[in-house]
């Protein structure tokens, strides 16, 4: 059995939102994605897109934001492991960036 006490669910959500906030504050590409999402929402309101189109937009926003968060996490872990320029570190970072 696991003897460590787990944090309450609300704390887990707090950690998640803290991570998202940090990514938005510190990562240029996340700021670009957020700005693009805002522009798409404005365009969607002006163009009166359908419910299906809103669902598609929201799904894509979520996927892009999630992949950017994963990319940021991969880059942070690689930087934590090594500050040196290594071929495998480059592959890990480039592949994570390519996922976005």
Q: Language-model features: where?
A:
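Membrane interfacial helix-start motif at the N-side
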Residues: 6, 13-31, 96, 100
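Short, structured helix-loop boundary elements
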Residues: 6, 10, 60, 86-89
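Membrane-embedded alpha-helical segments that form the functional core of polytopic membrane enzymes
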Residues: 40-70
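Acidic (Asp/Glu-rich) catalytic motifs at the cytosolic membrane interface
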Residues: 63-99
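Alpha-helical transmembrane segments of integral membrane proteins
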Residues: 10, 14, 31-36, 52-59
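Short, contiguous pre-domain boundary segments
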Residues: 1-5
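Short helix-capping/hinge motifs at transmembrane helix termini and TM-loop junctions
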Residues: 26, 47-51, 83
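Hydrophobic, membrane-inserted alpha-helices
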Residues: 18, 36-43
């Amino acid at each position: 059995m696991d003897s460590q006490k787990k944090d309450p669910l609300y704390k887990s959500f707090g950690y998640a939102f803290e991570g998202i906030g940090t990514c938005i504050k510190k990562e240029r590409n996340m700021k670009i994605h957020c700005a693009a999402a805002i522009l798409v929402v404005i365009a969607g309101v002006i163009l009166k897109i359908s419910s299906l189109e809103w669902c598609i937009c929201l799904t894509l926003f979520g996927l892009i934001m999630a992949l950017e968060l994963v990319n940021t996490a991969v880059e942070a872990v690689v930087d934590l492991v090594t500050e040196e320029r290594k071929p495998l570190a480059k592959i890990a970072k480039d592949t994570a960036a390519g996922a976005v």
